Amino acid sequence: MELELDLSFFYKTTILPECVLIFCLISILILDLILKIKDKNVFFFISLVSLLLSIFILIFQLKEEPVISFLGNFQADNFNKIFRIFIALCSILCIPLSIDFIKCTKLAITEFLIFLLTATIGGMFLCGANDLITIFVSLECLSLCSYLLSGYTKKDVRSNEAVMKYLLIGGTSSSILAYGFSWLYGLSGGEFQLQKIADGLVSTEMYNSFGSLLALVFIIVGIGFKLSLVPFHQWTPDVYEGSPTPVVAFLSVASKIAGLALLVRLFNIVFPFLPNQWHSLLEISAICSMILGNLVAITQTSMKRMLAYSSISQIGYLMIGLVTGNFDGYTSMIVYLLFYIFMNLGTFACIILFGLRTGTDNIRDYSGLILKDPLLTFSLALCLLSLGGIPPLSGFFGKLYLFWCAWKTGLYFLVFIGLFTSVISIYYYLKIIKLLITTENKEVTSYVQSYTVSSFSLLSKNSIEVSIIICVIASIFLGIFMNPIINILQINLHLNTFTNI
């Protein structure tokens, strides 16, 4: 299918989902500044409705032909539409996690939602950005709002430390990425748009030069920081531990979605001439991420730091699909990413609920939770087991498909490392579950003894519990419907114009 190019600013409904969110953001500002609404909960409702509307628009757009619009700077195809849906889905699941957290910590609701929606808009634009300037501006839109969200609890010393580290590392990574872009700009003869850069590298015969390889390395390093790939992961545990937990939940997934979408587009449009080089670099990084992330996670005593290293290992698994580099590999990466959204956010939702009721984040303090809150214990255990890849949960089927696609491509060593490290992850997840289900009174902590019992009603007024129920149901049943999900993805991904499939 030929790619339709339209140089008008708006073409049909290409950026309508983002426009809906921008309109929502402006509406919240006006309502807060002019009308001064006392019941701030209406802002959560407006945000959720706008995000749902954006997702519905993107779903209907899947039937449309790929097109480049926005003055040639934005490409809309089914690949980036799926990733834009995922980012909006993350925001929808994270907003309920934030409602009770913001109320308990007495933070400003309006500013929090503005930063969250702006980060969502930046991530969605990043998925379809078609030139270097749009990529960089979208990335900074996501990054700057992430810094503000990380330091949102200004009176918390750990939060201030986290945002300072995040800001310094983020600024460094953006500078490195911009330097890589400058090499592409120079080598291609002064081009900005991705396809024109690729054509320029061919016309100047620089596509296989040392300069192109240097640009590739700097771009991988710059995006590697955003994705928490080893060895660019050092900031992740400290930022996860110090930032507000709902913010960590959002960043742990949304940044990965946007970063992966950007990597796939860059590698397939700009660097199709250097497949061996970027395959090798990403394969080494994926192996290191899986091994180091899981090994260090075993030693952690903080639940958030443990999940930080777990997320490092998870991006290593997702890299397997990217390194596979074919149609099945990208499909398996998207399938696992979908499952990861629910099982990871479900885990964070459980941690937020426990933290609000006890004020602790220590893994040992979860001991004996089943005696006071069986529902939370059951939910956290299922999400952790799904992250570990235990059958018949969604995480198992996602990893199985991911490893199978890599095996068919001949990435045997990568699959072996993935299987080995998955076993390691099951070990430390089971350690936590063992603490949760202990019934010996002497091992039950004081935090659990004073714990407020949660409601078992599915109609609970607690928004966090609603998110937990949604994520747990998805973590259980999405894997059962994996074949229809794969078929739907494959049908829609065949409409791509940039992937070499």
UniProtKB/Swiss-Prot annotation:
Bilayer topology: Multi-pass membrane protein
Pfam families: Ndh2_N (PF19530), Proton_antipo_M (PF00361)
A GO term from the CC aspect: chloroplast thylakoid membrane
Main location: plastid
Catalysed reaction equations from the record: a plastoquinone + NADH + (n+1) H(+)(in) = a plastoquinol + NAD(+) + n H(+)(out); a plastoquinone + NADPH + (n+1) H(+)(in) = a plastoquinol + NADP(+) + n H(+)(out)
GO MF: NADH dehydrogenase (ubiquinone) activity; quinone binding
Signal peptide stretch: none
A Gene Ontology biological process term: photosynthesis, light reaction
Subcellular location: Plastid, Chloroplast thylakoid membrane
Positions of transmembrane segments: 15-35, 42-62, 82-102, 107-127, 132-152, 167-187, 210-230, 244-264, 278-298, 307-327, 334-354, 378-398, 410-430, 466-486
Protein keywords: Chloroplast, Membrane, NAD, NADP, Plastid, Plastoquinone, Quinone, Thylakoid, Translocase, Transmembrane, Transmembrane helix, Transport
InterPro entries linked: NADH-Q_OxRdtase_suN/2, ND/Mrp_TM, Ndh2_N
The protein's Enzyme Commission number: 7.1.1.-
Role description: NDH shuttles electrons from NAD(P)H:plastoquinone, via FMN and iron-sulfur (Fe-S) centers, to quinones in the photosynthetic chain and possibly in a chloroplast respiratory chain. The immediate electron acceptor for the enzyme in this species is believed to be plastoquinone. Couples the redox reaction to proton translocation, and thus conserves the redox energy in a proton gradient.
Subunit structure: NDH is composed of at least 16 different subunits, 5 of which are encoded in the nucleus.
Family that this chain belongs to: Belongs to the complex I subunit 2 family.
Name by which UniProt lists this protein: NAD(P)H-quinone oxidoreductase subunit 2, chloroplastic
Source organism of the structure: Physcomitrium patens
